[in-house]
Structure formats: C-alpha cells, structure tokens
Amino acid sequence: MSFRRKEDSLYQINFDETKQVDSFKGVDYSTQSSEQLIDLFSQVLKTGMHGLCFSLYEDGQKPGDTITEEQVRRRMKIIAPYTKWVRSFSCIEGNEFIPIIAKEYGIKTLVGAWLGDDPEINEKEIEGLVKLANEGFVDIAAVGNEVMYRKDLSEDELLEFISRVKDTIPDSIPVGYVDAYYEFSIKPRITAACDLILTNCYP
C-alpha cells in the first residue's frame, strides 16, 4: 500500500478525546413518538458527529442539476455546528462549492470526483478535484465512488485516474478510492494504489 504521509493517524477518531453519545442499540423505534425520535436525534446533534456526507440538493433537485453557491452556503450553515468533516461526491455542477464553503467554517473535507462511463464528465471531475486540492480546499481526495461495483470503468482506467491525481496534487493530501469493502480484497492493485482505503459497508 502507498503511504504518502506518515501522519495518516490524523484521520482516525480518538475516541478517548471525543464525547460520544451512548449507543441507542436496543431502542425500539416503532414505540417512539415523533417527539421522542426528535429528542434522540437532537442528542446526537448536540454531541456532534465526526463527519457527514453532504447533500446539496433540495426538494425536486437531483444529480445533474446545477446548484448555486448560495444554496450550498445555506445548507452548510445548518450542519456546520454539528460536524468536523464533510464528504462531497463530485467536483462539478455546484459541488465544487462544498469544500470551499466548508473551509470557511473550519470543517475538514473529503472531496470526491464522481467517475462514470462518460469520459468527458470524468475529465471535468478530475480537473475539478485537482484544482480544489491545489487551492487548499481538500484534506482527503477520493478518486471515484463504487466505479468497480457499477463496472463503469476498467481497473486500469481507474488506476490511471488515481495515479494522475496523485501526480498533480500536493503529497500532503492522501488519495483514496471509495467502494464496497470486498472490492479492495479482490482488486489488490487498487488497494496498493490508495493512501487511504475508503469502504462502504452495507449491513
């Protein structure tokens, strides 16, 4: 596995120093009133979360729609008091505002380039990720999300994108790839190319 920086432990939660909400394991949510559920959720929010996946969309909007900076700013303001990190999934169509605005709030960023089967869009995504990283808005760079799972690219194509990003952004920014956990076991070249393994686990 490639490690571009020794400080990778910066990206691990120190549970001894982080206030944690007691687990809600065993709670039967079907017996809870709306007010009780809101109270449980409020307890989590007040304690704070390590990170959130950030959605810039509002009712009636979807991926492919271009979102304004003002809308991203409005949504970021809502979550800023409750999280230390945000994850974004794309670097185009308004998603590029997410890490910029997050940094204004002192929030760390895991910034993703959404790769698929459209070469032109892939180029825009990679260019956007590189630009944001070189401008100081990226703490962790994610090159693709479940591309192997969806079979949108070949393994070699993905590896080329990962290599390209690593070659064109500062060495201090770890570069990883996001996929279902088992993809990293059956594709060791991808695992070796990543500074960080970013896995999705579905129960």
Residue positions per predicted region:
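Aromatic- and acid-rich polysaccharide-binding/catalytic face
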Residues: 138-139, 145, 179-203
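Substrate-binding cleft of extracellular glycoside hydrolase catalytic domains
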Residues: 91, 97-176
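N-terminal carbohydrate-binding accessory modules
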Residues: 2-78
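A short, flexible beta-alpha/helix-coil linker loop
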Residues: 57-61, 147-148, 203
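N-terminal carbohydrate-binding/catalytic regions of secreted carbohydrate-active enzymes
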Residues: 49-124
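Alpha-helical scaffolding within the catalytic cores
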Residues: 34-39, 93-97, 121-130, 179-192
